[in-house]
Structure formats: C-alpha cells, structure tokens
Design a protein with these regions (language model features):
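Catalytic His-Asp segment of secreted/periplasmic serine-dependent ester chemistry enzymes
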Residues: 270-274, 278-284, 289, 409
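Active-site segments of SGNH/GDSL-like serine hydrolases
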Residues: 366-374, 392-409
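Structural beta-sheet core signal
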Residues: 75, 243, 273, 367, ...
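Macrodomain-like recognition of ADP-ribose-binding/processing modules
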Residues: 1-204, 208-267
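Charged helix-capping and loop-helix junction motifs
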Residues: 218-226, 380-390
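Structural motif
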Residues: 74, 203, 270, 363-366, ...
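Conserved SGNH/GDSL esterase-like catalytic core that processes O-acyl groups on lipids
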Residues: 281-388
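Proline-centered flexible-loop/turn and helix-kink motifs
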Residues: 138, 319, 360, 399-400, ...
C-alpha cells in the first residue's frame, strides 16, 4: 500500500468527519470524551450470567460490526501516548491509524478537552512504559471499511461504537523482566475493564494489545489478560469479550499467527486426557510412557496425527486446545498385576496428578479407561473402588476442572 494513498484516504476521512453529514455526530463524540486516570474502579457493576470469550482472526471495527447486535459495544484503540492517532497523518499502518482512517475518531483524540490530561501528561513523563490512563469516547461513527485502504460504506452500514484509547508499553527500547512487564499489563488491562464497566459496555472488543508496532511478547500480554479476567471475575460482567487479532502470517508462510496462538492458548478450553492404548499417540504422551499408536501401528490403523484420534476430534469439535495427554498403553483403572505400586494404573498419584503443565490446569479432563479392566476380568467391586479413588484424586488435584468419564454406561 502506497503511503500517499493512505494519507489521501485519511484526509478524505477528516473532510467527511467535519462535513455536513457527520459534523453533529463528531461534535457529540468529542464532547463525550473522558480521561480515566490510573487505578480507576467502577462503582456500580451489573453482572451477567456468563461471558462468552472469543479469539478470532479479525480487525477491530470488523469485529465490532459483527458483534454489536449483542449489546452496547466498545473497542480498544492501541494508542500512541504522545501523538493523537499515532502516525496516521503520515500514512502509518498500525491499528490506531486504521481506526482513524475508517471513522471520526481522530477529531475526538485531538480535542482540547482530553489533549492536556492525556497526551500532554505522557509527553511530560517521557516514559516508554506509558501509564494506565485512557480516554473513553462514546458513539464514534464508523463509515469506511476496515480494509488496508478503507472504502466508503453505504450509509445504511454505518454504525456507532465506543472507543477506549489506551497505550501499551513500548518495549522495543526497554529492558524489563517478564514478571514486571506482566504486572504493568495487568494494571493497564484492569483500568480498561473498569472504564468499560463504568460505561455499561456489554460487548468489549480487545486484541493483541501492543504486540505489533510496540513489540510486546504476545504470551505475556495474553497471560495478563487471562489473569485479570479470572482474578477480578470480568467473565461474569460482560456478554462478550472478543479478542480480534489481525494475522501476521503473510503469503505462503505456514503456521498460526503467534499472536493468535498465544491468545488461543490462554482462552480456549484446555483438555487433558487420562486414557489407555486407544488414547496414546507418538509424540503426545510423557517421555517413557508405553505408546500403542507409534511407528508401523500408525500406518496400519490410520492414526498417525492428532486429527485422526478420537480425542483430537472431540477437542477440535469443541474448539479447544490439548493441554496434556497422560495416557499409557495397556493401563487399567485397577492395580496392574505384578506391579509393586499403583502406577501406571489410572488411580495412581502419578497419573491423576500429571494432567497440568506450567501451573496451567485443564478445563476438562477426558477419562477413557476401563476397557482393559473389563478385558482382563477385573473384579467389579475392586473396579468400583479404584474408579472412585481415581475420581477422588482428580477432584482433589483439579477442583475447578470438569471430569468427563467416556467409557462408563
């Protein structure tokens, strides 16, 4: 995309924003501006039964158009903390510039009622970490598409959306530890959520905040969002929280965009498997475990990839992610004859305690055990006792996880 085309597009957007069609709407949006300072907390909170959290490849305004029918919608503008609109006047292409080319947001950001308290404040600080301050603007009008070079939309497709303008840390010029950076993001994210709550937002469009031009690691940013949402129970307040993330994978590149992968890992439902032979797959079970689906067996059975397995199909159908597959070929729920201890039985401490990784617990534990107990004639009372022991240990180790028992009827 040529820079002069982007500059021309932005200039056209400004003419329309301040022209007869939008002058009044732009003025109302300007007057609605409010600067929220650090450590803000909303006083009144309306609770929702359950928040749907979505991670999808999309752009910010396109996601707003898609989900605005579900309730009052606000989007996060990944702001430049010292220059309104970032480099939009010069044809820059980061997220904020795209928003300013498609809407009347820019005149709101340059208005005197927020400039000194937000941009002037950050200019005086001259700090690459920026601050948790933000601007909340109501009813910004989106009238151009969210394409690389926005095009005018038909009038009936125009829509209004609230915009939260907040800057991420700029880490390209910073030396900062991961935990400290996550702490900075946690505080900033909390302020964003509290401002949204204060304005009765029902659908909040977020994204890979600061993971583009500002060079923040997506794993840390995604984790900060996840921890804040869980700790402050924001998943009980909004109807929808949407992470709209533009893919960075171009042309003939393969693999998932790192930003999307990081947010998927945090927010998609995580499954762990506790199973026997049919649940094993070469490369997916702990080192040293007995595996059935490996080598020539994979060729013979046609089970050579995760999408060929029963559990892979279940996880895919439920739009989830595999966390741990703790399956051992030939294992039973009951004690295996000849073994000194319970391991590798399904009721052993090693099996029932090995379904998490890196302090991340599963949302769902899929238990696929019992076939070998039946095949080798395990005593029903012994089986019942072992199964109850297994469930008891799973509940103790993973109190918040759902346990799906797939082989009992």
């Amino acid at each position: 995309m040529k820079r002069d085309e982007l500059i021309s597009c932005f200039q056209d957007t400004q003419r329309i924003s301040n022209g007869t069609m939008l002058r009044d709407a732009t003025e109302r949006a300007r007057k609605s501006n409010r600067v929220y300072r650090e450590v803000f907390e909303a006083e009144e909170v309306k609770f929702c039964n359950r928040t749907k959290i979505i991670v999808e490849e999309n752009t910010t305004f396109a996601a707003a158009a898609k989900y605005k029918s579900f309730g009052k919608t606000a989007v996060l503008n990944f702001a430049n903390p010292v220059n309104p609109g970032g480099g939009v006047v010069n044809g820059a292409m980061a997220q904020e510039e795209c928003l300013c080319r498609s809407s009347n947001l820019y005149p709101c950001l340059t208005d005197a009622n927020v400039f000194e308290d937000y941009y002037g404040y950050h200019r005086r600080r001259n700090d690459y970490l920026s601050t948790d301050r933000l601007i909340y603007t109501s009813n910004v009008t989106v009238f151009k598409t969210d394409d690389a070079l926005p095009q005018m939309m038909d009038r009936e497709k125009w829509f209004a959306v609230d915009v939260i303008t907040c800057a991420a840390p700029y880490t390209a010029n910073l030396r900062i530890g991961e935990e400290e950076l996550k702490r900075v993001f946690r505080n900033r994210v909390k302020n964003i959520f509290e401002a949204a709550i204060d304005n009765d937002v029902e659908v909040l469009i977020l994204g890979a905040f600061g993971c583009g031009a500002f060079k923040n690691p997506p794993d840390i940013v995604a984790r900060a969002f996840y921890e804040v949402i869980q700790e402050y129970e924001y998943h009980t307040i909004f109807k929808m929280i949407v992470f709209a993330i533009k893919s960075t994978v171009k042309g003939n590149q393969t693999g998932m965009c790192p930003n999307i992968r990081a947010f998927n890992w945090c927010f998609k439902k995580k499954f762990s498997i506790l199973g026997d032979s049919i649940s094993t797959l070469e490369g997916y079970n702990p080192h040293g475990y007995r595996v059935f689906h490996e080598g020539q067996t994979c060729q013979r059975t046609g089970v050579s990839r995760i999408e060929n397995t029963w559990w892979g199909k279940v996880i895919h159908a439920l739009d989830g992610e595999l966390l741990v597959n703790n399956s051992w070929s030939g294992s039973r729920v009951t004690k295996v004859p000849g073994q000194r201890g319970l391991f590798p039985s399904g009721c052993s401490d090693e099996r029932t305690g090995g379904l998490h990784t890196n302090n991340v617990n599963p949302d769902v534990i899929l238990v696929y055990l019992g076939t070998n107990d039946w095949a080798f004639g395990a005593d029903p009372e012994e089986f019942e006792a072992a199964y109850n022991l297994m469930l008891q240990k799973l509940r103790a180790n993973y109190a918040k996880s759902e346990i799906w028992c797939c082989t009992l009827c």
